[in-house]
Curated annotation (Swiss-Prot):
UniProt GO BP: mitochondrial electron transport, cytochrome c to oxygen; response to nutrient
Pfam families (UniProt xref): COX4
Protein name in the entry: Cytochrome c oxidase subunit 4 isoform 1, mitochondrial
Pathway this chain belongs to: Energy metabolism; oxidative phosphorylation
Gene3D superfamilies named among the record's database cross-references: Cytochrome c oxidase subunit IV (1.10.442.10)
Encoding gene (name): Cox4i1
Assembly and oligomerization: Component of the cytochrome c oxidase (complex IV, CIV), a multisubunit enzyme composed of 14 subunits. The complex is composed of a catalytic core of 3 subunits MT-CO1, MT-CO2 and MT-CO3, encoded in the mitochondrial DNA, and 11 supernumerary subunits COX4I, COX5A, COX5B, COX6A, COX6B, COX6C, COX7A, COX7B, COX7C, COX8 and NDUFA4, which are encoded in the nuclear genome.
Cellular component, GO annotation: cytosol; mitochondrial inner membrane; mitochondrial membrane; mitochondrion; nucleoplasm; respiratory chain complex IV
Transit peptide stretch: 1-22
Chief place of localization: mitochondrion
Annotated family: Belongs to the cytochrome c oxidase IV family.
Amino acid sequence: MLATRALSLIGKRAISTSVCLRAHGSVVKSEDYALPSYVDRRDYPLPDVAHVKLLSASQKALKEKEKADWSSLSRDEKVQLYRIQFNESFAEMNKGTNEWKTVVGLAMFFIGFTALVLIWEKSYVYGPIPHTFDRDWVAMQTKRMLDMKVNPIQGFSAKWDYNKNEWKK
């Protein structure tokens, strides 16, 4: 009996299509993304809805005045009508931001931090450079490889002239 009651409650909860959801003891409206929304974007210049959804009394009067001849509207009234419909103008949208300074600053910070880590590693983590990197050692190793005639067809020894004891030109 208890199991059927629990399953019926779970089923009702899962099937219900209410708009309100309960969260932390209060009712929260879920956002319906199927409805048109306002966005300021250069590539989408005319949004589906106006910027201001709930008009004040003065804005409603201005909207009524808009229905008449536009030559009777002052410049400020036209700007107010524009601001009811749009949040930003194209000039305001195209205006550069200072975000690039933050990006460049953070990139330089991380590059500098990485350089400090590399300097610290070179000083304290890595040992001395091996003796096999010394020029004399490399010369002796090269001479040994030439004496052994390593890869004589296309490789290292093919570029050495054994008669003249010099590199081929």
